Amino acid sequence: MINRSSGKDRDRSRSGDKELRINHKIKAREVRVIFDNGTQSVLPIEDAIKCARDAELDLVEISPNSVPPVCKIIDYGKYKFHQEKRQKEQKRNQKIIKLKEVRMQPKIDTHDLDFKYRNILGFLKEGNKVKVTIRFRGRELAHTHLGYGILESILERVGESNYVLESPAKMEGKTMFLIIAPKSKK
């Protein structure tokens, strides 16, 4: 079938998206045509369009950057449907990892630390990275060893079995932080 546009000219150079050129929108004089049976031949554009029209299909430019451009004789509507279906499938399988932050102070109580630890474990089980931040104020900066102790106790409780330390404890200005990430499931 020959694709007839409904008045909307979707020229790839203008729209910016990856819309493929079909039939008379292909600008090359010669194209490499791949037929249904897999054979290839280099043809003038008029002959290639005529072959596509005879087969009641479309001439679709697959690789415009090669010399000569590569075209296939296929049903464009069906091809576009399969491409969109494949993109949706890839998008569905894509895992988005967020960075969650848990803040605390160096003079945190044990019950509060337990509560923060449960939050950290929950975030890691959801598959998110966790940035554990300790903010120092005033004279607390003289006691950074307390912050390192808190971060070490969190790491011991989290354990190495399911999680990996992505960024070790660092001090930036008045804050100390580390980043824990879940191990990738491959």
From Swiss-Prot:
SUPFAM superfamilies, from UniProt? Translation initiation factor IF3, C-terminal domain, Translation initiation factor IF3, N-terminal domain
The main location is cytoplasm
Name a biological process GO annotation.
ribosome disassembly
Q: Where is this region: Disordered?
A: 1-21
Q: Which Pfam families does this chain map to?
A: IF3_C, IF3_N
Q: Offer a single GO CC term for the protein.
A: cytosol
Q: Where in the cell is it found?
A: Cytoplasm
Key words of the record: Cytoplasm, Initiation factor, Protein biosynthesis
Q: Which GO terms describe its molecular function?
A: ribosome binding; translation initiation factor activity
* Family statement: Belongs to the IF-3 family.
Its job: IF-3 binds to the 30S ribosomal subunit and shifts the equilibrium between 70S ribosomes and their 50S and 30S subunits in favor of the free subunits, thus enhancing the availability of 30S subunits on which protein synthesis initiation begins.
Instruction: List the NCBIfam families hit by this protein, alphabetically.
Output: infC
- Description of how the protein assembles with itself and partners: Monomer.
Q: What name has this protein been given in UniProt?
A: Translation initiation factor IF-3
Source species of the chain = Borrelia turicatae (strain 91E135)
GN (gene name): infC
